[in-house]
Amino acid sequence: LLAHLVKIGEKTATASAYPLYELEDESLPEVGSYSVVLDSKDNAVCIIKTTKVYVVPFNEVSKEHAYKEGEGDKSLDYWKRVHEDFFSKCLSEVGLKFTTDMKVVCEEFVVVEGA
C-alpha cells in the first residue's frame, strides 16, 4: 500500500526514528540520493530522489509533513497515532523506549522513475 502511494505521487515524504540511526551508526539520508522503493513482496515499484532531510522532535512534526506522508486522512493526529505505535514497536525490539520528544528524521522525495 505505501509503495503504491509513493508510485502514484500521493506519498512524498516519510519519517524514521532517529535513535535507530544512532544505534546502527547509520548515516542519515542525503539530499540528491536515490532509493528503490519495494512493495511488500520485495518487488521494485519505483525509484525516488531525496529532496529534503531534516530532524525534529516527534511532537514538532508539522501538519504539512503529515499531509505529505499521504497516509490515512493525512491529518497530523492520524500521523502521530500511527507513528507513535510504529516507532514504539520498532524501538522496543532493540530495547529502547518511545518518547514524544524523540528525534524523528523527516525525508521528502520525488518519484524519478516508475518500475
Predicted features along the sequence, with ranges:
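Compositionally biased, charged N-terminal/linker segments
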Residues: 1-22
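Short, surface-exposed secondary-structure edge patches
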Residues: 23-28
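Loop/turn positions that initiate beta-strands
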Residues: 31-38
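Short beta-strand-centered aromatic/proline hotspots
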Residues: 45-54
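Short, solvent-exposed secondary-structure boundary/capping segments
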Residues: 56-67
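Contiguous surface segments at macromolecular interaction interfaces
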Residues: 70-115
